[in-house]
Amino acid sequence: MEQFQHISVTDAQEKLNQKDHNARMVDIRDPQSFGRGHVDGAFHLTNDTIVTLMNEVEFEQPVLVMCYHGHSSQGAAQYLINQGYEEVYSVDGGFEGWNKAGLPVEK
């Protein structure tokens, strides 16, 4: 069985900036937290939006999963692997780590 990979917040930002990879960030935090701030261009992944994600993102595209601290994202990342996505990362440190690193946030 395929496994997701771990990625640091700085490596995640670098991967998102590599336009040739067409990586997508998905954020699984609650709607209020997502609304207060998220990574620029992040897709808010919920039970209600999973079908939309699967229609918009090819299985070959890298997918980075972010939660609050980097724990819940691991289960979601494995779920996406099980759905057929080939390159899935759990962002270590989550949104809190992203903020602490001073990386850009969209509000």
UniProtKB/Swiss-Prot annotation:
Predominant cellular place of this UniProt entry's protein: cytoplasm
Broad enzyme group: transferase
Active site: 67 (cysteine persulfide intermediate)
Gene Ontology molecular-function annotations: thiosulfate-cyanide sulfurtransferase activity
Keyword Transferase: yes
Matching SMART domains: RHOD (SM00450)
EC number: 2.8.1.1
Database matches in InterPro entries: GlpE_sulfurtransferase, Rhodanese-like_dom, Rhodanese-like_dom_sf, Thiosulf_sulfurTrfase
Rhodanese domain residues: 19-107
Keywords associated with the record: Cytoplasm, Transferase
Gene Ontology biological process terms from the UniProt entry: glycerol metabolic process
Coiled-coil annotated residue ranges, if any: none
GO cellular-component term (any): cytoplasm
Catalytic activity: thiosulfate + hydrogen cyanide = thiocyanate + sulfite + 2 H(+); thiosulfate + [thioredoxin]-dithiol = [thioredoxin]-disulfide + hydrogen sulfide + sulfite + 2 H(+)
NCBIfam families referenced in this protein's UniProt entry, alphabetically: PRK00162.1 (NF001195)
Role according to the record: Transferase that catalyzes the transfer of sulfur from thiosulfate to thiophilic acceptors such as cyanide or dithiols. May function in a CysM-independent thiosulfate assimilation pathway by catalyzing the conversion of thiosulfate to sulfite, which can then be used for L-cysteine biosynthesis.
Recorded family membership: Belongs to the GlpE family.
Protein name: Thiosulfate sulfurtransferase GlpE
Species assigned in the record: Aliivibrio salmonicida (strain LFI1238)
Phylogenetic lineage: Bacteria, Pseudomonadati, Pseudomonadota, Gammaproteobacteria, Vibrionales
